[in-house]
Amino acid sequence: MKCLKDGHMHSHYCPHGTKDSFQMYIERALDVGLDEITFTEHMPLPGIFMDEKLLKECSPNEEEILLYLKEATKIKEEYKDKIKINVGLEVDYVEGYEEKIKKMLDNYGEYLDEGILSVHFLRLDDVYHCLDMSVDEFGIIAKILGGVEKVYDKYFETLIKSINADLGSYKPKRIGHPTLVRIFNEKYPMDYKNEALIDKVIKKI
């Protein structure tokens, strides 16, 4: 029997998401026939490596994430007879902050059923850029690297680094939106041909 699952859901704790309650997400999941869902709110970022105002829009802070984990755990128990709910985090891989990410995962690990590991940030000569922040920012990244194809290369190379990184025993086993680099494909179309690099990513996943 096929199990219908949504393994990447955010919550009202997400600064750039909706304010819909856990109950609204769950009731909608039941309405469309899902058997299992995973809440994967963004884990707090591991440091201030870019504009602080921008970073505050990316994830809950440490106080908020504890509230999220505790509320999600409570909701999971309340609905256990209706739907399987997993409590998780979306862990943003930030190159150079591996040790801090590992420590944070150790702190939150007791609450986690699963998680996803994602790449939103690219480090270019020790300056960080948010890949999916805006079309304009994507264009800046492409200009620095020397073209859109180079952005794809850098993204997939960073994705491989995230998979190889030692993030401890609570490191997520799933990769979030591995084609995120295509987010502005309408503005920056690319028929990406680096099959060798894509094969490396697929083998790692």
Where is each model-derived feature located?
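An N-terminally biased module of ancient metal coordination in phosphate/nucleic-acid-related enzymes
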Residues: 1-95, 99-103, 107, 184-204
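Domain-core and long-helix interface of multi-subunit machines
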Residues: 13-15, 111-205
